[in-house]
Regions:
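Basic, mixed-charge low-complexity alpha-helical segments
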Residues: 13, 31-34, 162
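Short, Lys/Arg-rich N-terminal segment immediately upstream of the first membrane anchor
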Residues: 1-7
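N-terminal export/targeting and maturation segments
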Residues: 22-100
């Protein structure tokens, strides 16, 4: 009788253990998903970008929303989604921000003074410009740093801000309906 009781207790402990494993993973998935929604609602753009691009977890949702990202194999190989492409007026390429980052980088190509210009922006959490870089190809085929007018930079910044805001709204709609 004692043997059957021990077996029964062991069976209960084993069942509880096996039940706890999927519950843990379900809870962890829910916690991560709710943290992303909370970041969206608090308008923490860098945190949202980090969570969306830090793994392949949201890759299908990003594609479903109409944005261009690398293949799943490339994402697994790199460990992040790089680049996240927003194909608006400027065709932005966003680098994935690191965890707890205070800023993030993006790149695009545009026309300045009728010449193709490569642009790099570093933006803070409020999409304010921290730093910028502009380069054009010279007659020798080498890239050289150029400067642009303040009005041109302001115009480009406003365009970038509106495209990122539109991305945030569309991703929120895609994920949370």
């Amino acid at each position: 009788m004692s043997d059957k009781l021990k077996q029964f207790k062991l069976l209960i402990v084993l069942s509880l253990f096996l039940l706890a494993i999927p519950l843990y993973f379900t809870y962890n998935h829910f916690r991560q998903s709710s943290a992303l929604k909370e970041s969206f609602e608090k308008n923490e753009r860098i945190e949202v970008l980090h969570r969306l691009t830090s793994s392949e977890k949201y890759a299908s949702d990003i594609r479903k929303a109409g944005y261009t990202i690398p293949s799943d194999g490339a994402i697994r190989l790199d460990g992040v989604i790089y680049p996240l492409e927003i194909e608006g007026d400027l065709h932005l390429k966003i680098s994935p921000p690191k965890e707890d980052a205070k800023d993030f980088q993006l790149f695009f190509i545009t026309q300045v003074n009728e010449k193709q210009t490569h642009v790099a922006f570093i933006l803070d959490k409020n999409l304010n410009l921290i730093d910028s870089s502009y380069s054009q190809q010279n007659d020798n085929g080498k890239r050289e740093i150029v400067s642009v007018s303040q009005s041109e930079e302001d115009y480009l910044l406003k365009s970038v801000q509106s495209e990122i805001d539109a991305f945030m709204k569309k991703m929120y709609q895609t994920l949370y309906g």
